[in-house]
């Protein structure tokens, strides 16, 4: 999933630590939401939502419908600004490769969104449906349920999910540090080769 270059969301800045927008960006996003809300009900229905996501992302229609159903958990056929804001932060986190950080910082709201039945557990099938939002590969998903399903019921409760987000974020940070270190070593090596000649 990618944001389309030049769309409104492309110009918003997501804080890399907390995965939130600045007050100025939230104000601009609220204004954008009110422009999209042609019915003046402070909500977006499924048609408006589809056209918005189709305009700003490369998601397919089925994926957009899945996302709408996830956000419209009480099945009223509309989403309000709070859910819209969460979606935009999710999209920006995905665009900036901060999916793990987003899940860690917002573990409770993410868990509640993925808990479709409201029974305080996330099944593998539910997570599979939404893994494209968080850039989780199939093997990672299998490993997640194998390693963190402590109760053994093939469903994650909130504590298991939170533990996963902590360890996942830690792994990502270690991987990024290793990549930065290797990149620095390559630059030093290239620099020294240039100066030897």
UniProtKB/Swiss-Prot annotation:
Region of interest (Disordered), ranges: 177-197
Protein's GO biological process? flagellated sperm motility; sperm capacitation; spermatogenesis
Identify the Pfam families for this entry: EF-hand_7 (PF13499)
- Record: residues binding Ca(2+) 1: 58, 69
Q: Does the keyword Metal-binding apply?
A: yes
Q: Which GO terms describe its molecular function?
A: calcium ion binding; calcium ion sensor activity
Q: Where in the cell is it found?
A: Cytoplasm; Cell projection, Cilium, Flagellum
Q: Where is the composition biased (Basic and acidic residues)?
A: 177-188
Which InterPro entries does the annotation name? EF-hand-dom_pair, EF_hand_dom, EFCAB9
* Main subcellular location of this protein, as a coarse class: cytoplasm
Q: Does the keyword Ligase apply?
A: no
Residues binding Ca(2+) 2: 149, 153, 155, 160
Describe the function of this protein.
Auxiliary component of the CatSper complex, a complex involved in sperm cell hyperactivation. pH-dependent Ca(2+) sensor required to activate the CatSper channel. Sperm cell hyperactivation is needed for sperm motility which is essential late in the preparation of sperm for fertilization. Associates with the CatSper complex via direct interaction with CATSPERZ, and senses intracellular Ca(2+). Together with CATSPERZ, associates with the CatSper channel pore and is required for the two-row structure of each single CatSper channel.
Q: How does it assemble?
A: Component of the CatSper complex or CatSpermasome composed of the core pore-forming members CATSPER1, CATSPER2, CATSPER3 and CATSPER4 as well as auxiliary members CATSPERB, CATSPERG, CATSPERD, CATSPERE, CATSPERZ, C2CD6/CATSPERT, TMEM249, TMEM262 and EFCAB9. HSPA1 may be an additional auxiliary complex member. The core complex members CATSPER1, CATSPER2, CATSPER3 and CATSPER4 form a heterotetrameric channel.
According to UniProt, the name of this protein is EF-hand calcium-binding domain-containing protein 9
Provide the species name. Homo sapiens (Human)
| Gene this chain is encoded by | EFCAB9
């Amino acid at each position: 999933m990618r944001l389309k270059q030049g769309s409104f969301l492309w110009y918003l800045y997501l804080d890399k630590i907390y995965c939130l927008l600045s007050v100025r960006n939230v104000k601009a996003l609220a204004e954008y939401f009110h422009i999209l809300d042609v019915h003046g009900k402070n909500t977006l229905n499924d048609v408006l939502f589809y056209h918005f996501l189709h305009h700003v992302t490369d998601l397919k229609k089925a994926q957009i419908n899945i996302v709408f159903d996830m956000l419209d958990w009480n099945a009223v056929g509309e989403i309000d600004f709070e859910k819209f804001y969460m979606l935009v932060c999710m999209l920006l986190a995905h665009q900036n490769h901060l999916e793990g950080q987003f899940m860690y910082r917002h573990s409770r709201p993410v868990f509640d969104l993925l808990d479709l039945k409201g029974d305080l557990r996330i099944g593998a099938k539910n997570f599979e449906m939404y893994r494209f939002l968080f850039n989780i590969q199939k093997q990672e998903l299998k490993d997640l349920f194998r390693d963190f399903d402590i109760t053994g019921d093939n469903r994650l409760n909130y504590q298991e999910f939170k533990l996963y987000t902590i360890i996942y974020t830690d792994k990502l940070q270690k991987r990024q540090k290793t990549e930065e270190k290797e990149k620095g070593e390559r630059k030093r090596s290239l620099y020294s080769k240039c100066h030897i000649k």
